[in-house]
């Protein structure tokens, strides 16, 4: 069973990425993470590190604290 926080986090990434009209591939290239890894995060299949959370937030142009406000 997937953890709820991972689901919310993945949804937040997808939502913010789509707001910027970025494909998974374009976003992955922008931040230096493999496209399949982005997909796994968005599908709540990965529990990622703080360093990668920072990369995601920076790539989306938002602060880590705002990024972590999960609803």
Predicted regions and their residues:
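Residues that mark the N-terminal boundary/hinge immediately upstream of a DNA-recognition element
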Residues: 23, 49-52, 63
């Amino acid at each position: 069973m997937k953890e709820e926080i991972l689901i919310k986090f993945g949804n937040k990434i997808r939502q913010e990425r789509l707001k910027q009209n970025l494909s998974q591939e374009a976003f992955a290239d922008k931040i230096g993470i493999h496209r399949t890894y982005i997909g796994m995060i968005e599908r709540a299949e990965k529990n990622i590190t703080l360093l990668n959370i920072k990369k995601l937030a920076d790539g989306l142009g938002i602060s880590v604290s705002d990024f972590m406000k999960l609803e």
